[in-house]
Amino acid sequence: MTKRTASIKRQTTETTISLSLNLDGSGQAEMCTGVRLFDHMLSQLAKHGLFDINVSANGDDIHHLVEDVALTLGKAFNEALGERKGIVRMADATVPMDDSLATVALDLSGRGYAVVDLPFSKNDLTGFPTDLVRHFLETFAIEGRLNLHARILYGSNDHHKAEALFKALARALDKATSLDPRREGIAPSTKGMLEN
């Protein structure tokens, strides 16, 4: 089996990022972005998606940092998926976190698009602006070339809402990136191929 991995380095005048991804990992996470809550959410993605993800990143502000990590992670997923042959392709997950419930449905179609409904009660999660959760998901979907629908259904604690959302994203990505032995070597599309 071909290794489904990617390593990407990105350096701009605003950020420096080094990221590695193994789609067939065991949930190992090493995150160092300097933003503790962001590291925590990225670790949820690795742990509950069973992806090995290492991120080392720094930037001139939190917006540029989150945006460029999302961009780099999306590119890494796209690269690791290759021609996307044999994958399940479409999946969804609904995940509770105490008072909160979030759902994610996605299609690794090769076409980046995001529909995001995130009713946070305020724009702050211990120093992390909640509007950056939306921006992360939209950027990740576009660069990862996946159709993503993400919604927080309800909850009273914004941290729990965000964590349920990242866990749902992880579970849906794990299912969608899984290899189906019945589709070995075949693109899961009536077109016979998926964009990459």
Curated annotation (Swiss-Prot):
Q: Which GO terms label this protein's molecular function in UniProt?
A: imidazoleglycerol-phosphate dehydratase activity
Q: What is its EC number?
A: 4.2.1.19
Q: Which PROSITE patterns match?
A: IGP_DEHYDRATASE_2 (PS00955)
Question: Keywords assigned by UniProt?
Answer: Amino-acid biosynthesis, Cytoplasm, Histidine biosynthesis, Lyase
Q: Where in the cell is it found?
A: Cytoplasm
Tell me the SUPFAM superfamilies matching this sequence. Answer: Ribosomal protein S5 domain 2-like (SSF54211)
Pull one GO CC term from this UniProt entry.
cytoplasm
InterPro entries with a match to the protein in the record: IGPD_sf (IPR038494), ImidazoleglycerolP_deHydtase (IPR000807), ImidazoleglycerP_deHydtase_CS (IPR020565), Ribosomal_Su5_D2-typ_SF (IPR020568)
Q: Give the source's domain of life in one word.
A: Bacteria
Q: A single Pfam family, by name?
A: IGPD
What top-tier enzyme class does this entry carry?
Answer: lyase
Keyword Repeat annotated: no
Which GO BP terms, alphabetically? L-histidine biosynthetic process
Please verify whether the record's keywords include Aminoacyl-tRNA synthetase.
no
NCBIfam families xrefs: PRK00951.2-1, PRK00951.2-4, PRK00951.2-6
Provide the family line.
Belongs to the imidazoleglycerol-phosphate dehydratase family.
Q: What is this protein called?
A: Imidazoleglycerol-phosphate dehydratase
